[in-house]
């Protein structure tokens, strides 16, 4: 069952540009930890120009759990989320991560 984790970010234009740079640097690290298809989504029209959504995919809930265990124990977590994202607040806000499953996946 495909699982996708989507982290919602909100920030100033400068903070979002820094998030883009950070996401580019983080994507290969996340892939080494087991994530697939890291992407940063931005609005092209309408509301939400101050928002960005970072998504990563997994083959199963257990794969997502293994990724989370590794990520939370990593230096990357401490340096990029706790320290860098913490220092960017309130210009950049992490609004949390929602985990979805692909409900109509066909075997």
Segments predicted by a language model, with ranges:
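Active-site-flanking beta-strand signature of metal-NTP-handling nucleotidyl enzymes
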Residues: 3-10
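Short, surface-exposed coil-to-beta transition loops
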Residues: 4, 49-53
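Specificity-determining recognition surfaces
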Residues: 103-104
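Short hydrophobic/aromatic beta-strand micro-patches
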Residues: 10, 55-57
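An amphipathic, aromatic/His-enriched active-site/gating alpha helix that lines ligand/cofactor pockets
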Residues: 21-39, 48, 57-98
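Short, surface-exposed ligand-recognition loops at beta-strand->loop->(often short) alpha-helix junctions
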Residues: 10-21
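Conserved beta-strand-loop-alpha-helix junction that forms the acyl-donor binding cleft
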Residues: 45
